[in-house]
């Protein structure tokens, strides 16, 4: 699943590389009515393995993925892979997620582990990512090394857990919330190394508002965890 908003410079390359990387995967582009024509370009690439889901407006990362989960679940898919549309996640590494899928409900593509690599990212973004994961790990009592990674695989069973949960995040905090749900339902989680490359075209969707939402929600979950442990 590839959520998009104004990614016309990147989406064709991501789709073509994904199709070349694995014959096992189908591709779903979830477009939030991109004004730059991303959705129309994705439509032109539709075939038996490539699909496009159009949403009426920009609603955030979380709602876009939920729409994609619903689409895939209704069609009987067993595994769901999240991937950014900007080329930062390498389609050629999807095999690492797929290989780890048997016996696991959540496979986290991790930048900050042996074998992982981050290229062309400014120090500010590195610090935000590392601090965010560290803070969330302490607040939630988790030991994973990249809670905010957007390159991950989810099982159908975890998707069912997500559907029955009261999700409260819209932005990148959604990725932390998914790990929280998986842990709460005692789902089996594993990490695999990935290469992350800073986008070369288009604009990042990261904003101060998104960072604040993730921080506020993580802090709230941390307080709730402390209260429930008493």
Predicted regions located by residue number:
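A conserved acidic beta->alpha catalytic loop
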Residues: 31-40, 87
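Short, well-formed alpha-helical segments that are part of the catalytic scaffolds
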Residues: 6-20
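Acidic helix N-cap motif at the loop->helix transition within catalytic regions
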Residues: 9-13, 36-45
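Catalytic donor-sugar/metal-binding loop of nucleotide-sugar-dependent glycosyltransferases
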Residues: 143, 166-170, 179-196
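Short beta-strand/loop segment that forms part of the nucleotide-sugar
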Residues: 24-34, 54, 83
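Acceptor/aglycone-binding surface of glycosyltransferases and processive sugar-polymer synthases
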Residues: 51, 55-74, 79, 91-172, ...
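Short, hydrophobic/glycine-enriched beta-strand segments
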Residues: 1-3
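C-terminal catalytic/acceptor-binding lobe
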Residues: 186-230
């Amino acid at each position: 699943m590839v959520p998009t908003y104004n990614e016309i410079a990147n989406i064709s390359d991501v789709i073509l590389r994904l199709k070349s990387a694995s014959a096992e995967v189908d591709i779903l582009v979830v477009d939030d009515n991109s004004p730059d024509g991303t959705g129309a370009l994705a439509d032109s690439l539709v075939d038996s393995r490539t699909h496009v889901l159009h949403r009426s407006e920009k609603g955030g990362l979380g709602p876009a993925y939920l729409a994609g989960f619903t689409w895939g679940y209704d069609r009987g898919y067993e595994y769901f892979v999240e991937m950014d549309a900007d080329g930062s996640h390498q389609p050629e590494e999807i095999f690492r997620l797929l290989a780890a899928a048997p016996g696991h409900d959540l496979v986290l593509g991790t930048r900050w582990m042996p074998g992982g690599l981050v290229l062309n990212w400014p120090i500010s973004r590195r610090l935000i990512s590392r601090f965010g994961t560290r803070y969330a790990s302490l607040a939630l009592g988790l030991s994973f090394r990249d809670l905010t990674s957007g390159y991950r695989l989810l099982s159908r069973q975890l998707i069912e857990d997500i559907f029955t949960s009261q999700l409260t995040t819209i932005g990148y905090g959604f990725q932390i919330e998914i790990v929280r749900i998986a842990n709460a339902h005692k789902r089996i989680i594993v990490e695999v190394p990935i290469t992350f490359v800073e986008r070369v075209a288009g604009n990042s969707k990261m904003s101060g508002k998104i960072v604040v939402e993730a921080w506020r929600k993580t802090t709230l979950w941390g307080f709730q965890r402390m209260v429930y442990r008493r």
